[in-house]
Amino acid sequence: MGLETEKADVQLFVDDDVYSRHSGVDYGDSEKFTDLGVDRDPRRLNSHLQLGFEDVIAEPVSTHSLDKVWICSHALFEISKYIIYKFLTVFLAIPLAFAAGILFATLSCLHIWITMPFVKTCLMVLPSVQTIWKSVTDVAIAPLCTSVGRSFSSVSLQLSHD
């Protein structure tokens, strides 16, 4: 009573192309979605986000829920993932794209007009600074270090056991 004695063989058949692009959701009107063939991630920046139900929920063989519960939870997972993503993109995509555009424009401007001229100026000045620094070390620091080295080289220590 209430216990399953036979295993039911439940299979979900989804076309690979449709599943990878649409998360298994069947669209009612195919004319509205004619541009889905365009790859919006050609460099595969977000390939790690292609999660399916089996990647998140897994029941070991020893503990299975009822087949209808498994099928309904799979369907609800896919539908809620689809609907929540669409809902969030409606409200967040445009403001976040605007903010990202401002951020990248600012960083590009700073890099082009401040950072690179500063780096090029430093690289242009460095040979003369290197020559001056070598002269300063040869004239002032090298004799000082040589004198200190000679002074300490004449020091000898003897240990005695008393």
Swiss-Prot record:
Its main location: nucleus. The keyword Nucleus applies. It is found in: Nucleus; Cytoplasm; Golgi apparatus membrane; Cell membrane. The modification Phosphoserine is found at S20, S23. GO terms for biological process: caveola assembly; endoplasmic reticulum organization; insulin receptor signaling pathway; mitochondrion organization; negative regulation of endothelial cell proliferation; positive regulation of dopamine receptor signaling pathway; regulation of cytosolic calcium ion concentration; skeletal muscle fiber development. Phosphorylated on serine and tyrosine residues. CAV1 promotes phosphorylation on Ser-23 which then targets the complex to the plasma membrane, lipid rafts and caveolae. Phosphorylation on both Tyr-19 and Tyr-27 is required for insulin-induced 'Ser-727' phosphorylation of STAT3 and its activation. Phosphorylation on Tyr-19 is required for insulin-induced phosphorylation of MAPK1 and DNA binding of STAT3. Tyrosine phosphorylation is induced by both EGF and insulin. Keywords: Cell membrane, Cytoplasm, Golgi apparatus, Membrane, Nucleus, Phosphoprotein. The keyword Phosphoprotein applies. GO terms for cellular component: caveola; cytoplasmic vesicle; focal adhesion; Golgi membrane; nucleus; perinuclear region of cytoplasm; plasma membrane raft; sarcolemma. Residues 1-86, 108-162 are cytoplasmic. Residues 87-107 dip into the membrane without crossing it. The modification Phosphotyrosine is found at Y19, Y27. Pfam families: Caveolin. It is a peripheral membrane protein. One of its GO terms (molecular function) is D1 dopamine receptor binding. Monomer or homodimer. Interacts with CAV1; the interaction forms a stable heterooligomeric complex that is required for targeting to lipid rafts and for caveolae formation. Tyrosine phosphorylated forms do not form heterooligomers with the Tyr-19-phosphorylated form existing as a monomer or dimer, and the Tyr-27-form as a monomer only. Interacts (tyrosine phosphorylated form) with the SH2 domain-containing proteins, RASA1, NCK1 and SRC. Interacts (tyrosine phosphorylated form) with INSR, the interaction (Tyr-27-phosphorylated form) is increased on insulin stimulation. Belongs to the caveolin family. May act as a scaffolding protein within caveolar membranes. Interacts directly with G-protein alpha subunits and can functionally regulate their activity. Acts as an accessory protein in conjunction with CAV1 in targeting to lipid rafts and driving caveolae formation. Positive regulator of cellular mitogenesis of the MAPK signaling pathway. Required for the insulin-stimulated nuclear translocation and activation of MAPK1 and STAT3, and the subsequent regulation of cell cycle progression. This is Caveolin-2. It comes from Dasypus novemcinctus (Nine-banded armadillo). The gene is CAV2.
